[in-house]
């Protein structure tokens, strides 16, 4: 299928400045105790930007591995298991664990799912060309709320598997 896309105005800029909602800080207490404890410590000892850097350091120090066939995570404390036990996953795993960690640290955060990449197909004389986006281009990342910038994109998969993001 082919879909058309049109863009205009300043709607995206305004949308990025919409303040966070309570859901952007929601973290089920006790659901992932190790992650919750780390985030809680950062919330009381680090300013928001330093919490992002601490998360980057945690992700890179854990020796996480990108794979499309990760081990099954347990029903209890799955994000703790991902970061401290199985240490393998794909973009949705890394984005959700980073987002939960930021929320536990008091930084509003959300997961964004979309596409990264695609292949430009030039015009063939009948049209104007198009971007061919396939399932393999699907990707998940996070956004965090940082004053005064608003929502800022953070892609924890880039810390784990930079070649996946290139």
Predicted features, each with a name:
Residues 16-20, 124, 166:
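Surface-exposed beta-strand edges and their flanking turn/coil or helix-capping segments
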Residues 93-165:
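Hydrophobic/aromatic-rich core segments of domains that either
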Residues 39, 165-166:
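Charged, low-complexity, helix-prone segments enriched in Lys/Glu/Asp/Gln
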Residues 49, 85-88, 92, 96:
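Conserved structured core elements
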Residues 1-85:
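Acidic low-complexity segments
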Residues 81-90, 129-133:
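Short, contiguous acidic/charged loop-to-helix segments that flank catalytic cores in large enzymes
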Residues 10-13, 59-65, 73, 89-90, ...:
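Solvent-exposed loop/turn segments at secondary-structure junctions
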